[in-house]
Amino acid sequence: MFTLVNRKSGVARGALGLALLLMASVASAHEHSRCVVDDRDREVCLHNAARRIATLSPGATELTYAAGAGDQVVAVVSYSDYPPEAKQVASVGSHTRIDLEKLVGLAPDLVIGWVTGNPAEQLETLEALGMPVFYIEPRDVEGVASTIERLARLAGTETAGQAVADNFRTTMAAIEERYRDRESIPTFYQVWDEPLMSVNDQHLIGQVVEICGGENVFGEQARLVPRIDDEAVLAANPEAIVAGGMGEENRHWLTHWEQYPNLTAVAEDN
């Protein structure tokens, strides 16, 4: 049986066929893309696994290496010293001031940005230049594990990344269980010296302090990274002081407190 098709219906059927073809093509392309949602709730998609990654914070560098993508990192920023191999990667400035010309010259196909650490206009400029930017801001243990998994997805290192993420979850759960029934130790975590800064309980570090049996003495502060002074620390009188930052380079952060022998952490050599 033959069906007669007039010109208008033929055009309509042709348009429908084209639309279906386009939809199938889009669906197929999306299916083969590497898509993940970043910590600004944006979907970031790459057609192929990233091969030239720029990490714009020391934390982003460490997490990208943890995801098994260290060999794909072509640019880092100041203080990206872990793992040690990261020190051999080209530096493109600090997390607050990127050498844009140098970064562009390295031709990254993926940039890992820090939501609250990198200036927004800096990352927006990179996006305007056509660089995909994946924003990270892990706030808890699960956030760290999830970030590793998502970075691994973008880098094509899913197997390695999943193993690290699972091990991290297991390790942190074991630590939490170990200290669960012990009395908490009032702890001051120092993230910077000038100005003197700590973290509150909403910060990842604050949560890790708690998991490890500490009680963050500045946990109730409104700001994620509050500025404080010596008087505030003396008033809080922590039993332990922990300094983050640059390893042995900031040893003086701890020796600074030795001038206060009545501070419990100093008296007990904690």
Can you say where each PLM-predicted feature lies in the sequence?
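Bacterial N-terminal signal peptides that target proteins for export
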Residues: 2-16
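Bacterial N-terminal signal peptides
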Residues: 14-25
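Extracytoplasmic substrate-binding proteins
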Residues: 30-36, 42-46, 109-110, 114, ...
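Short helix-initiation/N-cap motifs at beta->coil->alpha
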Residues: 39-41, 92-101, 117, 221-230
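A short, structured surface patch at a secondary-structure boundary
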Residues: 51-106, 110-116, 217, 245, ...
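His/Asp/Glu-enriched short active-site or ligand-binding loop at hydrolase and phosphoryl-transfer sites
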Residues: 77, 202-225, 245
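Structured C-terminal subdomain patch of bacterial secreted/periplasmic proteins
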Residues: 98, 143-153, 162, 182, ...
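Short helices/loops that flank or line small-molecule/ion binding pockets
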Residues: 100-107, 129, 228-237
